[in-house]
Design a protein with these regions (language model features):
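Alpha-helical structural signal in soluble globular domains
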Residues: 3, 7, 31-35, 81, ...
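Metal-dependent polysaccharide deacetylase catalytic core of the NodB/CE4 family, i.e.
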Residues: 15-97, 163-192, 227-244, 272
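Catalytic grooves of carbohydrate-active enzymes
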Residues: 1-2, 89, 150-272
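Catalytic domains of cell-wall/extracellular-matrix polysaccharide-remodeling enzymes
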Residues: 70-157, 250, 255, 259
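Acidic-and-aromatic substrate-binding clefts and catalytic sites of carbohydrate-active enzymes
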Residues: 1, 14-27, 94-103, 122-126, ...
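Alpha-helical scaffolding within the catalytic cores
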Residues: 22-32, 142, 213-220
Length: 272
């Protein structure tokens, strides 16, 4: 958040259920909301914590795998805890996958929700290349840009007003569509550290022109969409682990995110 703010950017802070029990995390979110205008959102990832395990007797975090009865109970617990800590309900939520029944329930029960990160693993035609028995192909075929999901199927855009689920859904990351023809694409995206995971940088200079080129490709979509373009840069604290990640040292992790924020900040200052 600090790096984004230094570059004149606002962020969406996705609070997890576990973080709602952390006074320091709540105070940081409140401060950045009041001072910088950051949005405080509610993620349905990060469910596992002592309180969750005691009630639901599981370490599973995949809300789409629970029964509908449990989904409703979890949503109620998480949303009400959020309200207790912040005094309002969130306008956006998200998970790695949000099935239609879950989305419909959230919109009906908490109508303030307008937006949700509703899918991830949007790799496309080569998604099968990295499937295993924990993920299968549940996420294959997720849309690549914002869409209005159908009440019947999250991955299907609503065909008309009757099918409109009442929210705008967005993908977890903005992937490189071209790269997905050669592989599953999860190492290629506008997330700076996806670029590191894909080893798409100069190991001597720690520069990554690919990142800026891909961001510009997404910006160019405005030419074909009445001036509108969409791009996501989704990052959590774990992506800047002091012990390193993806075989990269902390210094490179930090630099990539800092440079990414600086590039977006530069574009904003230029009115782009």
């Amino acid at each position: 958040q600090r790096l984004a703010h230094e570059n004149g950017l606002k962020v969406t802070i996705q609070m997890t259920y576990a973080s709602l029990f952390n006074d320091e995390a709540v105070e940081i979110a409140k401060h950045d909301h009041d001072v910088y205008g950051d949005e405080i959102a509610l993620s349905l990832l990060g469910l596992p914590c002592e309180e969750f395990r005691e009630k639901y007797k599981t370490k599973d975090f995949c809300i789409w795998m629970f029964s509908m009865e449990d989904k409703k109970a979890i949503v109620n617990d998480v949303f009400e805890k959020f309200h207790d800590r912040f005094g309002f309900y969130p306008e956006s939520t998200g998970s790695y996958y949000m099935d239609a029944d879950l989305t419909n329930y959230i919109k009906a029960t908490y109508p303030t929700v307008k937006c949700a990160v509703a899918t991830c693993w949007e790799e496309g035609p080569k998604a099968y290349h990295t499937c295993n028995n924990s993920w299968y192909t549940l996420f294959d075929g997720g849309p690549w840009a914002p869409w209005i999901p159908s009440k019947q199927n999250t991955h299907a855009p609503a065909a008309n007003a009757a099918e409109d689920s009442g929210i705008v859904a967005i993908p977890h990351l903005s992937r490189d569509l071209i790269a997905c023809y050669d592989g599953n694409g999860s190492n290629f995206g506008t997330h700076p550290q996806n670029v590191l995971r894909g080893m798409i940088y100069d190991t001597k200079t720690w520069e990554y022109p690919y990142l800026y080129n891909l961001i510009d490709q997404y910006r160019s979509l405005g030419k074909y969409n009445n001036g509108y373009a969409y791009n996501m840069m989704f990052v959590g604290p774990g992506w800047m682990n002091k012990m390193g990640r993806w075989e990269q040292p902390y210094e490179l992790l930090y630099k990539s995110y800092s440079d990414g924020c600086a590039y977006y900040g530069k574009l904003k200052k230029e009115g782009k």
